[in-house]
Structures are given as structure tokens and as C-alpha cells.
Regions:
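Conserved short alpha-helical segments that host acidic/polar catalytic motifs at enzyme active sites
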Residues: 1-160
Length: 160
């Protein structure tokens, strides 16, 4: 089980996201993270093992500006509870960040194919495989993001 919160608006996204994650704490989780797009259009990801309060402490001296963001609390299904396995996950270029709830049944096969193409993985989660697959389709076929996501979702057995 996980909690997913997203925000696009005029206010700073970080406080909205943290408030949303705190409302979902009762569901149980082992890690928390946020991805924010700042005013310079940079994508920043901050994540940690532990509670939302641990995430708040971790980012206390970091730039959490931006009016667009996603946030996630994770209950591990693939990979141990640790900072590397916490969501959101970056693509190799760090241009995409993804959070996900569910299980990608054929993630190991997809991961192996992507590794043979030079992709490097920093976690043992199925979600990181999905964000790398999206980027692979986007870059190798010169596709827009929506089409790359659609192709990536066709190439998996099960996203629940």
C-alpha cells in the first residue's frame, strides 16, 4: 500500500504535498519522497527511508521551491526499505520522475533488456524500471511523453 499526492498550482507545492502525505500516514509505509519542479524548471527529488517527519528533516536545508510536485509514501513490494528504493524514481537523464503503486510482473525481464542497452539502475524496484522504460521509448523513438508512457505500459504484463 502507498500514498500518492500530486499538486499543480500557484502556491508552493511542498507544503501541500507534505500535508497530503501526513493525511495518508495511517495506511502504513516504510519511506517517503517528493519530486518538485523549481522556478528554473529543474526537477528535484528528495526521498528517505522512514516517516514523513524524517523526509521533512532531510529536506529542511534543501531547495523545495516550485509549484508543481508529486509525493509518495511506500510500503515495499520490490526491494528492501531504504533510501534508494524510496519513490520518486528518476530516469537516467533526470528529466523524468515517477511514483507508482502496484506490481509490474515482468520488471526483471524489462530491467535486463534495459541494462543491455546501457541503462544503470540505482534501486531494486519495479518502478525504476518503468521510468527508465518510458525514457528509453521517448529518446530512442523521438516520442512525446504521452506516447512514450503509452508504449511503456503496453510492454508490461501487469500494473495493478
Amino acid at each position: 500500500m502507498c500514498g500518492i499526492v500530486g499538486y499543480i498550482g500557484k502556491r508552493d507545492a511542498y507544503p501541500v504535498l507534505i500535508k497530503g502525505l501526513k493525511r495518508l500516514e495511517y495506511r502504513g509505509y516504510d519511506s517517503a519522497g517528493v519530486a518538485l519542479i523549481d522556478k528554473k524548471r529543474r526537477l528535484n527529488v528528495y526521498k528517505t527511508k522512514g516517516k514523513v517527519s524524517d523526509l521533512e528533516a532531510f529536506v529542511s536545508q534543501k531547495d523545495v521551491s516550485g509549484t508543481i510536485g508529486i509525493a509518495h509514501t511506500r510500503w515495499a513490494t520490490h526491494g528492501e526499505p531504504c533510501q534508494a528504493n524510496a519513490h520518486p524514481h528518476f530516469s537516467s537523464s533526470k528529466n523524468l520522475a515517477l511514483i507508482h503503486n502496484g506490481i509490474i510482473e515482468n520488471y526483471a525481464t524489462l530491467k535486463e533488456k534495459l541494462q543491455k542497452k546501457g541503462f544503470i539502475f540505482k534501486s531494486s524496484t519495479d518502478t525504476e524500471v518503468l521510468v527508465q522504460l518510458i525514457e528509453f521509448f521517448q529518446l530512442s523513438n523521438h516520442l512525446d511523453l504521452l506516447t512514450a508512457v503509452q508504449l511503456a505500459l503496453q510492454d508490461r504484463k501487469s500494473v495493478v
